[in-house]
Amino acid sequence: GSFAYSNLSGRLQWGAQAFSQTQFFFTPGYSLYSSFDFLTRDQAVATQTMRGATVFGIYPISRFRRLELSAGFYHSSENFDDPSVQTANEAFLSNEFGVELFRDGLFAPLTATYVQETTIFREFGPLAGNTVRISFTESPKLGNTLSQRSVDADARYYFRLGDTGLLAFRARGFKSWGDYPDFTFFGGNSEMRGYEYLEFIGHKAFFANVELRFPLV
């Protein structure tokens, strides 16, 4: 859940929010030990719980473009749903690589984002225009906080065909680095059709697709 306050009275919009949220994702299906089989999809389910607060500001450059700035402080906890898999994973990574897959600690992220939105919508979804979102996040090392940097870019273009048809283009790139780099995960109907939901995960990722869309009714 979350609690938020927003002030939209001026051109510079600002606000703050406190949150506690848990989401699930699928970890890579690697072998924990040489005697183990690869993780099944059910065994690879993990959860990420984040609790903290952020302050943010939104400044419109024009009708279709804006800048967003935010600063926050939160605690992140990640773990496998299956405790036996969690124990085996920690032992394997510690013995083989001396690293941890999951991040557990405090972060103090500072984020700057550019957003462009000219998309025209109909009752069935986007029809024409484009959407661009580019963000950079810096989580510095402050005392016992964990450090990371991330860049995330998402661009979409909708080319109208007739009254209701369109070609939809999308490209997205993500990269995170530092002592405790962030993950991105994607896959499924909304991003990569034909693949399992959230099938892909990593610190670096890129995908692009083109779709021909037209409503049947």
PLM regions with names:
Residues Q17, Q23-F24, G29-A46, V55-F56, ...:
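C-terminal outer-membrane beta-barrel translocator/porin domains of Gram-negative envelope proteins
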Residues G1, S62, F80-D82:
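Interface/linker segment at the passenger-translocator junction
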Residues S9, R65, S77, T118, ...:
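Conserved NTP-handling cores and scaffolds of large molecular machines
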